[in-house]
Amino acid sequence: MQRRQLLTTLTLVSTLPIALPVWAQQDYSKVEIKAEKLNDTTYMLVGAGGNIGLCVGEDAVFIIDDQFAPLAPKIKAAIAAITKKPVQFLLNTHFHFDHTGGNEAFGRDGALIVAHDNVRRRMTADQLITFIGAKQNASPKAALPVITVAAEISFHINGDEVNAFHVPRAHTDGDLVVHFRKGDVVHMGDTFFNGMYPFIDTSSGGTADGVVAAADRVLALATDKTKIIPGHGPLANKAALQAYRNMLATVAQRIKALRAAGKSDDEIVAAKPAADQDAAFGGGFIKPEQFVRMMLNAIPK
């Protein structure tokens, strides 16, 4: 039942480069949603798929992303254990199914869904996510963002100023990063995979330079005490984001240099330009050779 529910959103395309990540294939009945308190009003919820941000307080319940559709009841239960108020605002960091799967359930409950302009555009039509081999089917009306933003938007709730800003052509063409100014928390969505090689969705407008630029923007506003919620991986700090940014910039520069020297894509892969990064970042669902091939697509020729 759980897998059938997911496949109403996804169609797998077996001829494409890699299998769907393990967190999109698991038995959702066994997933536990765990909450980590970051400050008096802000939490990170972890289950399967993208990490969720939660802001509670006297004004409203505000969440960032909502993982997979089959997990919506568990996510609601985890929120209800923290606050009895309904979710009023739901912000999507981008359109991917592991961050928007619960939209329909929350939308039908009355949550106002907020996202970048390109997220709504992509969610209204079928999307081919080439690198992970999946077609994301068009979303029902209740799952669509009702408020869209081109550049940035602010929410003044629960004693905080929550600023969501667009980072162009990063993980996709519709990424929002969310900064809790007073709480000193940042949710980066999939512009940040903590401790692992990232997935950059080049078929949806993503670029390596855009991911580096997104990291640079957050690094400029972060302090050593800032808590950073990545799209995937454990809670991070500024040092972890700096290491991730440096890895991406270093590998990108090496690939650009090899291209400038006339090397073919296969020769660049054989040169292993990320080999010294594999120990620190190669343990995620994007494996070292896949990462280099993805970077070849994510760096314009």
PLM feature segments, named:
Residues 1-18:
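N-terminal secretory signal peptides and thylakoid transit peptides that target proteins
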Residues 37, 60-61, 68-70, 120-250, ...:
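Metallo-beta-lactamase
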Residues 49-52, 61, 68-71, 95-100, ...:
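Solvent-exposed loop/turn segments at secondary-structure junctions
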Residues 35, 58-60, 70-114:
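Active-site metal-binding motif and surrounding structural segment of the metallo-beta-lactamase
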Residues 34-78, 176-180, 185-188:
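Conserved beta-strand hairpin/beta-sheet module of binuclear metal-dependent hydrolase folds
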Residues 41, 55, 65, 79, ...:
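Divalent metal-coordination and catalytic microenvironments
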Residues 16-25, 220-225, 234-301:
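Accessory terminal helices/loops
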